[in-house]
Amino acid sequence: MSNQETEAGSKTISNDNLNVQITRGTHCQVKFDITVKPEAVVAAYQKALKTINKEINIPGFRKGKAPQQLILEKYGSNVQKECVDIVLQTGFNDALQLTHIHPLKDGHIKRPIVHYCTQEKGAHFVLEFEARPTIPSVQPQELHLHHQAPVQVTDEERKNALDQVLLQFTTYQPIEDRPVQEGDFINVDVTILEETPRLIIDNQRTQVNQSGLPSWIQEKVIGLNAGASAEGMTQPNEKFPDPDFKSVPFRVTVKTIWQGNMPAIDDELAKKVGLQTVDELYQKLNERLEQEAQEDIYKQHIHHLEDQLIEKYPFDLPLSYIESNKQARLDDYLKQLGQESQLPQNYEEIEKMIENSTIRGLQLYFLLRRVAADNKLEVSEEEVSQELSKQIALIPSGKSQIDIYGDKSKLREQLYNLALDRKIKKFLLDQAQWV
């Protein structure tokens, strides 16, 4: 076997029967330009002749025993077609073995272009197909992560957490004789005023304060009577700035106004949530907030880890992978928007966002699975059960990543993948260099 570099992006490999020029394109596209030697085509032609001989019936001869000349006279075109098929299949298989390139299952394969196939000249044909992605090996020690400073729980966060407990036991009385004031509770609709208006909040009850409403909605509802509406432009979140934020027009409608009667903050309130004293309630709330702060730091570490994996270990993805996964995500996103039957005005922006998210998700999936394979990381049944408990605990908050009522085999696969991802990321965090 010989191996020779040719033009940029191309390489030639050969054996006794054929030469293969390999050209790699974007999205794992591979082109095989294959030249087969005459001797190999002669062998393929003889094989094709025997195959056709066994398939046909010629009066006066047993099947498979007819003279070759007679077969060629009557079925010469069939023999030639069978010969071409054999040369294509054999040449392609030999090329795969020589190059160690594997076609992608269910990937795009173009129809072969056959330039010629004769016993005198040999054969020359071109095949283009999607190959499996080549996943680079990850070296965990090459990852450099920064420790995030611990975040202190603020008094405002403690107050908001306590307010959430109070709201569970708040009673409401309608207000009908005045407009909205700060501190009231209201039921509101919020509609984004696109070409086709899109309702994003439907009759939701919230308090008119900083924790209940963003300032740009709060300033519009104060002074409105029940049934009245106001319009404005959305504004960015000052605490969490988004460089891609774009202001859009909206309409807010106050459906009803309520006075909220909150319970006293005492031991009786604590008992309603399964505790004994109000001091114990404060302690539990503080512990929960501290745990959430730690989880936020962990999420930042994971996000930084994922960014480094994408940056340090780039690789190409098959277009069919991207398209199929993007379409599934796009359909889900439009369904959540309630616009699966009509495309939103900013459809192209949404499609690009989904495509970028899809590519990132696929790259991370393959890199993490490569880490698992290289380091023999597996998940036990106990770890799958623990993942189920974690996901069930997240259901009330809406953060669970499983469909508990879905297909049982798919649920098992979801839990296994979540547990494996968790294990791989912990392994990488433990092995990375921290600064």
From Swiss-Prot:
The PPIase FKBP-type domain extends over 183-263
What name does this protein carry? Answer: Trigger factor
Function of the protein: Involved in protein export. Acts as a chaperone by maintaining the newly synthesized protein in an open conformation. Functions as a peptidyl-prolyl cis-trans isomerase.
The chemistry this enzyme catalyses reads: [protein]-peptidylproline (omega=180) = [protein]-peptidylproline (omega=0)
Swiss-Prot/TrEMBL domain comment: Consists of 3 domains; the N-terminus binds the ribosome, the middle domain has PPIase activity, while the C-terminus has intrinsic chaperone activity on its own.
Q: Which GO terms describe its cellular component?
A: cytoplasm
The family database entries (InterPro entries) matched by this protein are listed as: PPIase_dom_sf, Trig_fac, Trigger_fac_C, Trigger_fac_C_sf, Trigger_fac_ribosome-bd_bac, Trigger_fac_ribosome-bd_sf, Trigger_fact/SurA_dom_sf
GO terms of biological process kind:
'de novo' cotranslational protein folding; cell division; chaperone-mediated protein folding; protein transport; protein unfolding
The gene that this protein is the product of is tig
Return the similarity comment: Belongs to the FKBP-type PPIase family. Tig subfamily.
Which residues belong to the signal peptide in this entry?
Answer: none
Give the top-rank taxon of the lineage listed in the UniProt record for this protein.
Bacteria
As recorded in UniProt, its EC number(s) are: 5.2.1.8
Principal localization?
cytoplasm
Q: Which Pfam families match?
A: Trigger_C, Trigger_N
Gene Ontology MF terms in the entry: peptidyl-prolyl cis-trans isomerase activity; protein folding chaperone; ribosome binding
Entry-linked SUPFAM superfamilies: FKBP-like, Triger factor/SurA peptide-binding domain-like, Trigger factor ribosome-binding domain
Task: Provide the alphabetized UniProt keywords.
Answer: Cell cycle, Cell division, Chaperone, Cytoplasm, Isomerase, Rotamase
Localization, UniProt: Cytoplasm
